Amino acid sequence: MAEVGRTARLALALIFTTAAHAQLLNKDAPVIVGHYHLNVTSIEAHKKFWVDTLGGTAMKFGPGIDVIRFPGVFLFLREQKPTGPTRGTAFDHIGFAVPDVPKLTAKVVANGYGLTVGREPGPGQTASPPTAGNYGRFSYLVGPDGVKVELVTNEEPGAPPIMHHHVHFANKQFVEMQQWYMKAFDATLRAGQTDYFIGADLPGVGYMLNFFSWLPEEAQTGTKGRAVDHIGFEVRGLEAFTHKLEAKGIKLTEPYRKAPELGNIGVAVITDPWGTVIELTEGLRDLR
């Protein structure tokens, strides 16, 4: 069984490696993961992690909103003490792709940040040790306020120093969760499903949505108020898309509107059945 587990992990590592470059922004993709909204205790502490350590770019958006830009994604920072880390919600971590995982991981540790595991053990199981990169291909980091980040290897020639790669969920109902996201965003099942992992690909983008099984006994809570408050999907034809969601039986938490405070982009909000808040936008990709 241990050998099967090692083989599965290696297979996942190879998938991560070969798929990374596909996440460069496809301007024609109907749906992309466009941003994450973080509640942070300190803007400056987060800049030291996201900018000084990982290599993002600090910028301002709209009425003085602090934003960190990476190729493929924005992180919106709101200075408001979070109610908890990403752990404990069905949102597990943000995935980035880099050319040299061990090198950047060493920098992260040298700058005082911690490492963690990919999947947490269940009752009576032995925890995996903190990782400096399984097979040197990927590692899991913990930033300020308990935001979990994964680094995966990008071996494509000319790969940027860092780029957004995927979003990863963890849930006891991980298969049902994957099916909900396929339904909502017209994603497709990805090959390589295991007894603890399943993925979904966004149209025109490919590798993006990953789902782990959640083994700990503790119940999970919603993302609102947590370190990662919500995930943002950028959608072409957003108003019509919201009507399609409603026709699928997916209710809007907040109806479609134009947001003048954000440059008049289109905005709507939905919440998945496990409490993950999802902001839908149209217009953010034009700022890249």
Model-derived features: positions:
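N-terminal secretory signal peptides that target proteins for export/translocation
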Residues: 1-6
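Vicinal oxygen chelate
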Residues: 24-28, 31-42, 66-67, 84-169, 190-194, 198-213, ...
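Mature N-terminal segment immediately following signal peptide/propeptide cleavage
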Residues: 27-67
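Conserved active-site tyrosine of GNAT-family acetyltransferases
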Residues: 46-51, 108, 146, 177-182, ...
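Solenoidal tandem-repeat scaffolds enriched in leucines and small polar residues
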Residues: 173-196
